C-alpha cells in the first residue's frame, strides 16, 4: 500500500472511532460491540506506530475518550483522569510488563500488582474539601468533565462527609458508577410494562441515569459505586501502595471492590485474569475485563504517562460475549402489526452472565442468508443486554437430520392466514385485532408513555383483560368499571381505582399522541406529528388521498398507503368513533403560517457536527417550523447540509455529491431572517 492509501486508511479509522465515541459517550447509544471498537482502535494505533508521519494531534489515540455535554457545567479535574491502554492476549500483557520493567531504575525487581475487576460503568471524580463532598464530575475528556454533583449525592453509598476526624484538605476520589445486574433486569422489566424506554445494557443505564438534568430521576434509579483510586490530594500523607490507598478509602467510608487482589509478576496477573473470567457470570455486576496496576506509587511516578494512558496500568479485556450452542426448535411470536417473528429455542447457555435459551432470528431473509436450520450448532451473541441473536452456523457440526425452518401457513395464536408480500422480509398474520397477540401488543402500545400514557396498564394486566374476554377493542378500556377490575387476581380496589383514574386522565391528550396510539403501520412519533400539524382532526385525515399524503414531510408512498388503508377499514372507524364518544379529546391546534419564501421551505436538510449556539433537536425544530424536511443521511436528494464543528462522514459525502454546505453563521442568519 502506498502512502496515500495508508493515509486514507488512517483517516477512515479516525472518523469511525470519532463516530463510535460520540454515540457511546455522548448519546449513550453504542453503535458497535466493544470488541469491534477495540479492533478499530488497535488498528489505528498500529498504523500510527508504523507510520508516525501520519500521526496527528486530533487522532482519537491522542486523547481520553468522551466529550463533556453542553447540558452540564464543565468541571476541571485537578489531576487528569486518563483512560487505560488495553491488552487482549498473554503476549500483549507480557510486552506491557516488559516495557514497564525496562523503564524502571531497578529493572531486575519482580513487580507487584494491584488487580481489580474492570467494571462496565461510568467513571466519576468526587472532590472533598475539608472532608466534605463539594463537587463531582464525569471523566469527560480527561481534563474537564460534567458537573454531576446533585446526581452523585443520590447514591446512598457515596459519603457526603468522610468518616475520619482528620481528613485531607482536598482529595479527589475516583470511582465507577454502575447498576447491578439484578436491578438492571428489574428496571427494564418494569419499563417495558409501562411502555417506557429500556436500556441496552447496564453501562448505558448507569450513564443515562447519572447524566440526568433532574436529580430525582437519578435518585429513582438503582445506582451503585465502587471506588478504585485517588487523584489529587493536599496536606495529607498517602500510603506508598495502591492497595493500602484502597484500604484508606474504605476507612474514609467508600465502597471498594471485594474482588481486589495482590499479584506478583505476569503469572500472578494471569492467575487473577482466569479467576475473574471464571467468576464473571456469578458477579452481581457487569465486568468486561480486569485492571492491573503496579502497586508501588513511587514506581508509578517513575513510569509516568504516555499521551492518553499511564505506563503503570492496563486493562486486560475479556473475549466478546459469544457462545456456541444447539438450536433445538423455532417458535413464532406475533407483534402489534401482525409481524410474525421467528425465535430460536436453544440449549441453555451462559453468555455475558445471563443464561440464554432464546435468540431472535429476525426474519426469513436472515434465516436464508445465514442458512440456519433446526439442529444446527450456532454462535449466539449477547452484546450488552440486547436481545441475543444467532450470528452464524458452524457448518462442519451440522447433523444429517438438520431441518429447514418453514414459515407457518397459519398464525400460531389465532389461526388466521400468514402472508408475506413479495417485497417484504416480514410475514404477517392477517387476523388484525381478532388475533389476541396483536390485540395485546396494540393495547400495550396504546397505553405507552409516548401514546395515551395510561399509567398502571402494563403487560400482565393487559394479558388478563384480553384472556378473560373483558376487552376486545381499544375503546373497551374506557368502559371498564371498578367491580370488574377489583375482582381480577392481584388487583384490589385501590389499584382498580388508580387505573380508572389514569384512564380518565389519559382522555385529555393531543392529536399527534392519539394518532400515534392508533398504531397505524409505518407511522411513528414523527409521522404522527406531521399528520396532526397538517390535518388537525380525524375527519380531514380520513378524506386524505395517497397523493396528498405523499406531499408531506416524512410520509412516503408506503406510509401513505397504510394511512389510507387504515381509515378505509370500517372496524377502525368504529373504534375511533367510540373512543371519541367516550371522551378522548385534544385542544385544536393553532394553524401556523409558514413563510414559503424562506430558503428552507420544502427542502431536505441534513444536520452534521456540533452547533455552538443550539442543540441538534432545537436546530431540527427550527427547520421543521420553516417547512423543511430533516433527514438523517446524505443522498442525491439532499438540498443542504448544515455543518457544525467536528462534522464527519456526512460532510465528506455531501462534498462528493456536490450538495450545498451551510456553515453555522449562515444557518443562523437564514433561520432568524
From Swiss-Prot:
It comes from the Bacteria. This is DNA ligase. Pfam families: BRCT (PF00533), DNA_ligase_aden (PF01653), DNA_ligase_OB (PF03120), DNA_ligase_ZBD (PF03119), HHH_2 (PF12826), HHH_5 (PF14520), Nlig-Ia (PF22745). Zn(2+) binds at residues 411, 414, 429, 435. NAD(+) binds at residues 34-38, 83-84, 116, 139, 176, 293, 317. GO terms for cellular component: cytosol. DNA ligase that catalyzes the formation of phosphodiester linkages between 5'-phosphoryl and 3'-hydroxyl groups in double-stranded DNA using NAD as a coenzyme and as the energy source for the reaction. It is essential for DNA replication and repair of damaged DNA.
